[in-house]
Amino acid sequence: MEATKTDLRLLLECLKYQMKWPGSQKQALLTIISICKQNDQYVEFLREIGGISFIYNLSKSSTFSQVKETALFTLASLAELHESCKQALCREEMFRDFVQHLEQEMPLTEKRVAVYMLSVLVANNRCGQTLAKTSRCIEALLRLFRQSFPVPGESYEQLQLWITVSSALCGSVNNPQNEENQNVCMSVFPEIKPWLQEVALPRAELAQPLCSFIGMTVANNPCAQEYFVSVGGLDSLSDTLTRVLSQSTHSASVCKMATIITKTLSACISNNELLGSSLSKLRVIPGLLRLLSSPNLDPQDQLAVVLTTGHLTDACVEQQSQLLSAGGLPIIITLLTETSDEELKKAAIFVLHTCNRITESLGPGMSTIDPNECDREGQWRSAGQILQRIQLLEKKIGKKLWERDPESQPHSMKRSDSHVECDDELWEGSVMRKVKGNHRVYGEFRAIPAGTPITSEILQDQDSLQPDSSEEGLSPVQVNLFKGPNWEKSKKRKHKQKRENERSDNQETRREGVNKRELKRNVKSERVVKRLKMMNLESDDDGYELLQNCSTPTEGNRDTQGPDIFRHPDPVKRNQREPSLSDDNMSLCTELLDKEINKFLKPPSASKSNTLRCAGCVKHMNELNSRSFGAVLSSCRFQCDFHLTLREAEDRFRRSQPLKRTSHTPTHTHINTHRKIREHSTSAQEHKQKSKREKHKLSHQSSDRCYRLTPLRRPRETYSPDVKQWTDHRHLKKSSEDARSKNSSGRHRKRQNWSDKELCYLTKGVKRFGHSWNTILWKYPFHPGRTNVDLAKKFYHMQKAKAQGVDLSVAKAL
């Protein structure tokens, strides 16, 4: 970085000392731009060393045109790269210099670079917009905008200058919106009206800058919108759009130009229904529908076309009739069902929602509509077919969702009707107003014969036959399209009847739940028994196939052909493991137990309902193992079927084991006490070994009545020296316990002096673990027979001897 900063200093010196060489200065300026584009810190460094000020002075004082152009372009590029540089250049004197610069006679390229510099300073900058107005720079730009409009046959540089001026004006009035500058710029609307008539295929390059300026100036400004309409600009824009839309299906460039004009039209009529209703005579809706169905339309531009259609249909009923007569409903609904863009879906629903008054236009107002343009029965038939398509698509989407992730769906089996709530906020009437809607997804739709005309009476009959076909039974679009004339009268009655049905359904659901719980208490689960029995089928090929293909029994009788398509699938056995080839059925039972414990003792998540029933189900995995399992279940008054079966198996296992009896004979004072103790210890060891052999033999018997509930103990690895030292230490501890049991008949243990190593172990242990005597005893290899009390007393004596100044060698015998 330091080397780059040195290069910037050298380039700045080159600019200062090469005043007579414009080529060298131009190359130095372009090199500065390329360096500063690498890192924003270089722009800040150049500003600190005075490079920005020098380049600006060079743009004013240089006598070479190419140096002025390059200097202005360098300033614009640096301001675009760094915000602090832009704010440093935003001074009123600089804007006044720009005004003088634009009014002078200069080459078109230099003037274009100056306008580009000005557009960078006002873009996304409230301070720059204000300075452009106070310094009368906007007036200079408007004069240049009028004078530089390219007539046919002029040079390409003239067109580029006019496009740059339009961009600078757009930045001064919007982003952020500046109403004062908008009111100043709308004075050029009368000159724009004839320009709109020249926007056609031969001069398609005029559409983008001209429409951008109009859209930015009238956006969210009712005063500018009304003035644009008063000078005839809206009519001229609509005529241009109608003329271009007729050619949109033949050329992609014309389709792009039509999209640009459509966006401008939407900005001119947004939030103003009166302006939208004035366009009904021009019949813009059919042209927009042709544009929407054009194969040349970019999918990214569909949103603007649909929004403009929604603004027009929301303005008046006549344009809704135009939408219906031109076949707009199938196009909009097809777009709604096939697109994956959420914003486009909202816009399509907004268009359909604005057609809620279409029934009125089809009813009393039919006399004012040409019968050749609007076939009522044909449109109803078309709408019915579209409704069937929507519901078929909903079925397919629902099946895909269930197949993709059935566990993430809500548990709706307890309810008779599955309804999905849609919380998306939709535009209604205008961009600022919003509406919410609910819809219920149906599993079946009673198909109507294609030859039968679908009228409002037929739809009313369907509503009477289907108690759920109310406003909650259909989507907001379907409700608005298929409301009959008597729908409002029966709405309250249907809501009242629905509430009564919901109360009765809730009571029946509660009674069914109580009955099911009573049945579950009295009937054992056959599912666990089948799983345990299937473990013995591993040697049978048929049993192996059965184990691979089996699934857990379902709860209740469910009709797979029922109308409720959005229902939970039957629970299946996931991630099924192939049967092990081990001959030890006890280890298989242990693996099954661990698997079921992991399954039932998972912490409840947000997407699954809490179905814990007993202490075995409630305990977490770190609180429960195969040894504490029986104690936990015995403390619970009620066990589920699964844990009750496991507890019975454990009881059978414990009853089959031989009772371990340890006889403790009273000690008497006798000469041969030690000899009898040794004999007793020998007999106890023999009995213990015999019991182990019997248990090992019993564990290898293939019996269905006895199962091992604890995993087989694996031999410890003794390869590392730490493990070996720990094993030796445990062996020493065991021998010390045997020694204590052998000497338990006497009153005192044999006295053993403390070695130097033991004292060292004790000192290190206290430093490391404090007064945790048990930890110290098990951590270090003390002499067999030492206890935690011995360690505590010895440390106390050591501290006492140390305080009295006694040598620790003497304290060994304390």
Swiss-Prot record:
Alphabetical list of SUPFAM superfamilies matching this protein: ARM repeat, Homeodomain-like
Top-level taxon of origin: Eukaryota
Q: Which residues form a coiled coil?
A: 488-512
Note down the stretches annotated as region Disordered: 461-521, 551-584, 653-753
| GO-annotated cellular components | chromosome, telomeric region; nuclear inner membrane
For this entry, list what GO says about its biological process: homologous chromosome pairing at meiosis; meiotic attachment of telomere to nuclear envelope; meiotic telomere clustering
The Myb-like domain covers 746-799
Annotated ARM repeats reside at 93-136, 327-368
- Give me the stretches of Basic residues compositional bias: 689-699
Q: Please give the name of this protein.
A: Telomere repeats-binding bouquet formation protein 1
